[in-house]
Amino acid sequence: MKRITLFFIALFACLFVGVQSTSAAASKKAAPKTPEFVTSGDGGTYYYVKFLRNEKVMSVSSDNCIRLYAGSGESSQQWRLVGSQDNFQFQNKDGQYIVVSSQSAAATDGGAANPNPLRPSTSEQPGGFKLQVAPNTDNGTGWEIVANSKSGYNVVNLWGDPGDGNSIGFWKTNDQNNVVVFVKPDTDLGAADYKTVGSMTFKPENKLTLWYTEPATTAKLYSGGQGYSNWMEYALPIGDGQFGACLFGGVYRDEIQFNEKTLWSGTPARSSQGGKGYGKYENFGSIYAKDLSGEFGLTTDKAASNYVRLLDLTTATGKTMFKSAAGVEYTREYIASNPARVVVAHYTASKGGKLSFRFTMAAGSITADPTYANGEGTFSGKLETISYNARMKVVPVGGTMTTDDEGIEVIGADEIMVVLGGGTDFDAYESTYTKNTSALAQTISDRVAAAAAKSWAELYAEHVADYQSFFNRCEFDLAGTKNEMTTNSLIDSYNSGRGADALMLEQLYFAYGRYLEISSSRGVDSPSNLQGIWNNINGVAWNSDIHSNINVQMNYWPAEPTNLSEMHLPFLNYIWAMAEKQPQWKQWAKLQGQNRGWTCFTENNIFGGVSAFKNNYVIANAWYATHLWQHYRYTLDREYLKRVFPAMLSASQFWMDRLKLASDGTYECPNEWSPEHGPESENGVAHAQQLVYDLFSNTLAAIEVLGDDAEVSATDLATLKDRFSKLDKGLATENYTGSFGSAIPTGTKILREWKYSSYTRGENGHRHMSHLMCLYPFSQIEPGTELFDAVPGSICENG
């Protein structure tokens, strides 16, 4: 059981731990709104100058610096722009200007030095400033502020790790710490959220619940950053398997950021890493519910008290709860319903007439402008291959609702339901990868209308029954565990080994892994990507693509062992369609010199397209084929096996033709690589050999099951048996020489990663352990053998 728990920890890491992108295709976005410029004298519009990275505004601090703090309405935080877009001065309501100083200041309160900070002054900045549209849109569209008197590093920049109290310095263009927007204090909070006070008494109704006592937008980040990190570390994901959302739990502005698994830019082509043709997984957009109740604010007397937000894994329900100073209790509930194929938000209060909001939509990394009519909002558009459509409908009970060009306003309601739908015209089986484009808008509209015609109670009951038909198939409980600490507190205390609390976190990991599997892998025949189906990042790391060198496979390790076989099918059908029905993967095999079979490379999009990054990783076909066989082993579905067997056989033919006979009489995979380090190309790499061994073994076993239905020629069968019998299994040991430190004693036996190169050719402490496929998932070595006993040393040697 402990080993299976680790699989779910791995799944969680695979879905939600990002890596910094080295390149990502940019998407065009509409220009940000231009602020007002005044020529001279009094008057004009005063703005908060808000940095999108940390949602803080330029403020005059006590140490005579311009620093970033939450907007509080102070006159020193409100700036007008005097001059023109190419040459202007900042002046606040106190008459102070902003100048570039040569007197260094701390980057943040107590942080490292900033050599050229912005400071307040009674005099103007020589040369002034200019505004230019920010090319970086990772956190949304905005402006860059350029100091006209500087060159090179001349763009105003949030200095240091984003937080509270950052000073302002300078950097080069196209950095996410540069991007600002100009917002009016009477229409924008100028802070991440209202003041909240967490509940001290809350305990979740269901034990398997992730819960927190502050909004995701204001939570302390483990990474030290802001922006996307709030999403990655604290937003709560919901999903129907294909369409999903992330919940931030804001009181002032409740953001429901949504995604759809097939919203990809790019084409079926092969392109350079991050090239436009390859595309990326796009951020679909967000719904914003701005609080208009007047009950809450930034001060203690107007704080939202008893604050809790949670994700109940037992019911797949998100929830936010808090109380006003007047004692009114507010509850917001969220589901992503697979039966209805929509995301639904439900707003209630303990007293009638207390719900007042303005609802708006915004596109994410795509270019689209929403329109509003009759309590609904929608936007649509087309990328290189696919078209998309999103629609929301606001359904109030009581109060008044008005709709204008800017959004939907509800005042004094007793209850509000918001229904959100979205989709694309993607079809995995069409040669164009699209179908029914002209009907897309009507399909989404009908879907939203059908859900909106039902009550929250009906939608919720359908959703829970559907979800629990999968989730309740498996139960894992650790004795003595109680969920009495916030989830972030469980994480903080885990390394100190606090008994039942540590076990509680492990139990949550297990449940969360299964929850994510159900929530990200139903519907369309396309697998979960590097982030499952969730992404709020415009310049997303590694394009949030389908990585074939462990990531997508790891997503599906829990599917069969924990009775979620149906969740495996989107990946399995993707493999089958690409291998047998679509041409791209056969083209990539030919590109690698093979006339038979199919393969893909390290980085893949949903159209069969690949990037040029590590395109010698052709062993992906063997690994994919093991998943086809695993599903049969758990289901014993012979008709399924008969359908997918041609893809298994074709992958075997690729390797039957490709293997090279070595001088030791064994067959080796040529020019292989052990992800993601060591020699770029070597024959007989353990990772590839172990994979081909499993592929051949499974293919022969499938032939035994199918008999004549396998339709294998006598020549191919004889060749397969010959190659299998003479295959180098990739199982050998070497002695550790002490080159990578003292984690294990010199002379300890470790598994060989390369047949001809020592372990020292690899990277010290590298994260991949690709030569341990023989242990898991393939079980090719047995306890009590020299090979099995070499595994602990191999793990320790890798750090």
Predicted segment positions?
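Short beta-alpha connecting loops at secondary-structure transitions
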Residues: 673-684
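Positively charged n-region of N-terminal signal peptides that target proteins for export
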Residues: 1-4
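Aromatic-residue-lined binding/catalytic grooves and analogous aromatic/hydrophobic interfacial grooves
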Residues: 193-613, 630-632, 649-652, 662-667, ...
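Extended, hydrophobic alpha-helical segments in both membrane/secreted and soluble proteins
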Residues: 551, 617-631, 640-657
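Sec/Tat signal peptide C-region and signal peptidase I cleavage site
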Residues: 19-23
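Lectin-like carbohydrate-binding module/patch detector with strong preference for beta-trefoil
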Residues: 25-193
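Bacterial N-terminal signal peptides
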Residues: 8-16
